Amino acid sequence: MRTTTSRLVQLSCGLVAAVAFLGMGTAGAEPTLERGRYLVEGPAGCGNCHTPQGPDGPVADMGLAGMMVEKNDMFTAIASNITPGSRVADWTDVQLGRAIREGIRPDGSIIGPSMPFGLYRGISDDDLMSMVMYLRQVPAVDHDPGQSVYNIPLPPAYGPPVISVAEVPHGVTLEYGAYLAGPIAHCTECHTTFGPKGPMFDTHLGAGGFEFHGPWGVSVAPNITPTRLAQYSDAELDDMIRKGVRPDGARMLPPMPYGYLAKMTDEDAAAITLYLRSLPALPDGGQ
């Protein structure tokens, strides 16, 4: 158990660093616990990977305590315990933020898949620190889910250092819809065709085709460009995104985080729909 004095010193240091970090962002911006809760428990769906799952859903009292999320020939990916009961309690707010947004731990080591760092690099400073603020006060869980194993080389970094990302104005707009569907909810990570180096955003954005393996069997991320979405009304598409229910009443398969997306506001859901409607129409799998 870490001492109270040690934790207070850690929080003080983190606060000073975070204030300096935020000073590089949008003038007058202010991260909030409420925003952090909304993002983590809503569209960002952090618990979809970081909360252990049982036969009936999330395991009680194990929120964000970590679990294995993918096992294949290339790697066994284990989502870390990100509660205050884990090693992240020893990290400053800026260090935790950097791990989330850039995939770099305080010791300089790289976090591997399945975290979508190509998109997370676009999380705004304000939203990032709001999420960190919320993660600092979730119940601490003493649980070690294990370590990821990679049979592929990891990059030295996922790009140049992220200095600052400005806030995207909220509203039912293409810009905010792209931000929600990209950096926040990472819809375009799972639904973009993968190549040897990962999602092919430049040529296959939203074309689908990636296979997911889990207790439910195998599910394939569908094409979310107008090629497939044009057949659905906005209301039908909203039910599919937030309820996991097709127009014919059929339930959709995991791992899409329907329980988290259900907590999105109507405005945010509408912004995502607006953005998806604007994508270039592509054939399934980008073929």
Q: For each predicted feature, which ranges?
A:
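C-terminal functional regions that serve as terminal interaction/effector modules
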Residues: 231-233, 239-286
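Bacterial N-terminal signal peptides that target proteins for export
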Residues: 2-15
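Small-residue-rich helix-loop
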Residues: 195-199
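C-terminal segment of classical bacterial N-terminal signal peptides
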Residues: 13, 19-27
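Electron-transfer interface patches adjacent to heme c in soluble/periplasmic c-type cytochromes
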Residues: 44, 66-97, 118-128, 204-240, ...
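Extended, well-folded interaction surfaces typified by the phenylalanyl-tRNA synthetase beta subunit core
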Residues: 142-154
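The canonical Cys-X-X-Cys-His
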Residues: 36, 43-53, 131, 177-180, ...
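Electrostatic cytochrome c docking/interface patches
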Residues: 25-42, 155-183
